[in-house]
Amino acid sequence: MTQTLKEFMEGSEPGPEGPPRRHRTRRPAAGSKRIRSGLADRRLFTMMVIAAIGLGLVLYPQAADWFSSISHSSQLSGYAQEVEQLEPSARTKVLDRAREYNSRIPGGQLRDPYSAQAPMPALEGQLRDYQSQLNVANDDVVGRFRYPSLNIDLPIFHGTSDDVLAKGVGHLYGSSLPVGGPGTHSVLTSHSGIPNAELFNPLHSAKTGDIFSTEVMDHTFLYKVNRIEVVKPDDISSLKITAGEDSITLVTCTPIGVNSHRLLVHASRIADIPKDAPEQKTLAGRQANIGFPYWIVYFVGGLLAFYLAFLAWNRRRVR
């Protein structure tokens, strides 16, 4: 059948038999937009979860170190409160007892704190005597270690067990207690490279001339770095006491993650901090500084940036 002009203009065509049929324009199903929107929402949720996991993995070391700093601050505050509750005469007695201990520390007990070799066994009485020194709160906290230029502020504990080295600074048994005095050499150590805390990671940036302190009871003992060296684990020759000298050596493993050698930071006692030294203001304060949790800002900011980028991409895609 021949199609008329009117039929052509109206969009109809003749059927095989009978009257012409009119074309119908197909319209999207009513729920198709909702389906596409639901798919976009699920895609956004999935991508946000992936982004959160990725940011979490990247920022985990910073977050873990911040929470560790809170724990360190709590331990230091508890130690300070215990010391303040002691009478001045009692504090003096504790320090005098520690200095008397230093005058008779057992010889031959120095060992690399990270070596798999078992340490030389101490007599039970000697070990009990050691652990009772400076232990005013019965929690094995000996004092406080601060290295301002490296942002290290940690409690000092008895011994160098794995538990101790993972939570703060350990005092090496067989070395002098960190209470100063001629003919003393204290060895302090902590881990580097563990994922949940910085601890002695920054020690690899130590420089000669840096000033750090130990705080025991109500006394602050100042030390200035005079020598830095890297030695093999079994080389303990520079950890021995030198007559008339008041020294501290800081020890950690190096290189980080390899741990084949030991980084030794040697320092000698000084009477006071030079007025122009950057440590002057920091060491004058007592409050532990845990720092601002920038990792939260980075995490939230990263998720927000990803969310906005996804919305912009999805909008262009729909168009």
Model-identified regions with their sequence ranges:
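Terminal targeting segments of Actinobacterial cell-envelope proteins
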Residues: M1-A40, P278-L283, W313-R319
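C-terminal single-pass membrane-anchor helix
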Residues: T282-R319
